[in-house]
A protein has these predicted regions:
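Flexible, glycine/charged-enriched surface loops at secondary-structure junctions
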Residues: 1-6, 83-90, 110-114, 158-167
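Glycine-rich anion-binding loops of enzyme active sites
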Residues: 1-52, 166-169, 177-179
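Short, surface-exposed beta-edge/turn micro-motifs
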Residues: 37-39, 134-137
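Short, compositionally biased
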Residues: 52-68
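Active-site-proximal betaalpha loop/short-helix elements
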Residues: 64-134
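A structural signal for short secondary-structure junctions
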Residues: 104, 129-133, 145, 154-157, ...
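Helix N-cap motif at beta-to-alpha junctions
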Residues: 140-147
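Acidic, Ser/Thr/Pro-rich beta/coil linker or hinge segments at domain junctions
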Residues: 155-199
Length: 199
């Protein structure tokens, strides 16, 4: 079974906002499957807008049903073709927060190059790094699979598909870098989710 959900430990009342129970054929794209020397890629829909003043990038509510189904089937297709082998959907933590969850569960160091991150026109770097896109994924890809990824995404002009970093051996940590140098964003001494590669 596949079980998932969202809850909030700080809520003044007991609530579960989303829950999922079902079966999948696989292969499963667990974030634990990332390996050292994998490349970190972002796949996200740039055709959208922020919802009101919230950090939510809405690329769904104005999209056609046909396009939504096309996007829905893309990641499973890439998994079945063994083009990507580990992934994590970009969640409320944005690109940077999701990278932390990815590194924590994979037990790897992730180095993100901020200057490689593509974003929609008119969106600031900070807003894009921290927003919750309705369609966005961080993916672990072997360098040898990159040509196949680019070919598979050729028909998706609305999607950002860019190499933004790398996985390395070492403690679970995330570094961000640009032309001015690199800085530590997070390391395992301060657990985020507590779901580590070891457990």
């Amino acid at each position: 079974p596949m079980v998932g959900g969202h809850s909030n430990q700080k809520s003044p009342y007991t609530a579960l906002s989303v829950s999922i129970l079902g079966l999948v054929d696989g292969p499963i794209l667990s974030s634990r499957f990332a390996e050292s020397e994998d490349e970190l890629w972002i796949i996200a829909n740039k055709d959208g807008c922020f919802f009101k003043d919230y950090p939510f990038w809405d690329a769904a509510t104005k999209a056609s049903a046909t396009l939504l189904r096309k996007h829905f089937s893309l990641i499973p297709f890439l998994a079945k073709k063994n083009i990507i082998h580990a992934a994590k959907d970009i969640s409320m933590g944005g690109i940077t927060g999701t990278a932390v969850m990815f590194a924590e569960s994979a037990g790897k160091t992730i180095v993100i190059d901020l200057e490689k991150i593509q974003r929609p026109e008119g969106v600031t770097e900070f807003d894009w790094l921290t927003c919750f896109p309705s369609y966005g994924f961080l993916c672990a890809i072997k360098p040898s699979k990159v040509p196949f990824l680019k070919e598979a995404l050729r028909a998706y002009e609305e999607l950002i598909c860019c190499h933004v970093g790398n996985f390395k051996n070492g403690n679970s940590s995330v570094y961000i870098k640009n032309s001015n140098g690199a800085k530590l964003l997070w390391e395992e001494d301060t657990p985020l989710t507590g779901f580590t590669h070891a457990n």
